[in-house]
Amino acid sequence: MSTKEQVFFKQATSKNKIHFISLGCSRNLVDSEVMLGILLKAGYEATETLEEADYLILNTCAFLKAARDESKDYLQRIIKAKKESAKIILTGCMVSKHKEELKPWLPYIHYVLGSGDVEHILSAIESKEAGEKLTSKSYLEMGEIPRKLSTPKHYAYLKIAEGCRKRCAFCIIPTIKGGLRSKSLDQIIKEFRLLLKMGVKEIILIAQDLGDYGKDLSADRKSCLDSVLKEMLKEPGDYWIRMLYLYPDEVDDTIIDLMESDPRLLPYVDIPLQHINNRVLKSMLRTTSKEQILDLLTKLRTRIPHIYIRSSFIVGFPGETDEEFQDLVDFVSEGWIDNLGIFSYSQEEGSVAANMADQISQSVKSKRLKILSQTQKKNVEKHNKQLVGQIVEAVIDGYHPDSELLLTARFYGQAPEVDPCIIVNEARLVSGFGERYLIEITGYVGYDLVGRVIKKVPGE
């Protein structure tokens, strides 16, 4: 997983200046937004400048070794750049699972908070003594918690559960985040309504596995995700709901029916498949087979022909043979997946797979990663070529990172941060970010589309 820094700031004038750096996934970002909200409500002010901050909060990621290395790099940079009197608060997944790797820098840390203890950020900052709090309790179980959005004002993430009940062989998330803990339906709907009231137009539902939502709350251990979606869709308005992280065995007919019947529940799903070969899937301790995966994808494409499917695959899992890898290449080449994340297997201490025999060399993993990436790129180029000349409804996210002469936009098949975008090079009609426009696709550059604005969507 690639990590992305998120920096939170506003103009700060007091002596209680805080500077946040959040690494890792969108779930981590929500935790950072909650901590920021708590501190702003308590009277602290956020600053963009690390060097002028009185308190520096680093929310770490530990999903893969590369993420842990990045967390350590940021910590060293903070220690070196901060003013002498500033205090560092360290939180997040790395603290919860890999604290021993942080040992050389712990003398510089004022307070350590586990990933389930974000609601204690205020007491950590105000503590006169250095300390730590590492528990498995989640703020999801608490009452109302303030939150300060760091995303553009038109979209936001809504975390409906924490932890994971799956036990995939390659993953250490359950040991970091603990077991499944679902928010109550009432709390979710309350947050959903608040986001709509704030003007958010795209709400992205996240959890370790959305489909597991409510299995810890219901007597029959069945998913209650459909209840969440039905309650949300009762709210009036022209908003988008996007689902991320929905395991293949949790996509049932009820979810498909809702996507088919209400366009506000976007025809977009992120289904982490990880592999397609049955022996590898079994070794990964996955609960679906190749046949079940193909049945699901066929059903989705048949019921909702315009659906966009995102997924992720791991290459170089222990014992993966050339033939088994070729099965994956053949599957990807068939074009089932629109947006794809590809990762080399990472031998994570504490995972079942870490102790498996037949670990694959890094050179082989890198070669397989390149082959699969090239295979998917051919699919994307073919698909993008078919989109040229079509008109799509898309939201303007903001300026392109390379030039303020360009804008970026997304249609329903593109999630923020993780998917390609539309590069808008003709935008004279755009009057504001976060608004939806009809955009003609005129070309593509790599994975990204290129387009021009035709007109604003009526009602925007």
Curated annotation (Swiss-Prot):
KW Membrane (keyword) present? no
Signal peptide: which range, if any?
none
Query: Looking at its record, which EC class is this enzyme?
Result: transferase
Domain MTTase N-terminal residues, every copy: 16-130
- UniProt: [4Fe-4S] cluster 2 binding residues: C164, C168, C171
Which residues are involved in binding [4Fe-4S] cluster 1?
C25, C61, C93
Task: Report keywords, A-Z.
Answer: 4Fe-4S, Cytoplasm, Iron, Iron-sulfur, Metal-binding, S-adenosyl-L-methionine, Transferase
| Cellular compartments annotated | Cytoplasm
**Which Pfam families does the record associate with it?**
Radical_SAM, TRAM_2, UPF0004
Annotated SMART domains: Elp3
Superkingdom of this entry's organism? Bacteria
- Occurrences of domain Radical SAM core (ranges): 150-382
Q: Where are the transmembrane segments?
A: none
Q: Name one GO biological process term.
A: tRNA modification
Query: What EC number is given for this enzyme?
Result: 2.8.4.4
Would I find Electron transport among this entry's keywords?
A: no
Q: What PROSITE patterns does the annotation carry?
A: MTTASE_N, MTTASE_RADICAL, RADICAL_SAM
NCBIfam families in UniProt: 30S ribosomal protein S12 methylthiotransferase RimO, MiaB/RimO family radical SAM methylthiotransferase
HAMAP family documented for this protein:
MTTase_RimO (MF_01865)
State its role.
Catalyzes the methylthiolation of an aspartic acid residue of ribosomal protein uS12.
Q: Which family does it belong to?
A: Belongs to the methylthiotransferase family. RimO subfamily.
According to UniProt, the name of this protein is Ribosomal protein uS12 methylthiotransferase RimO
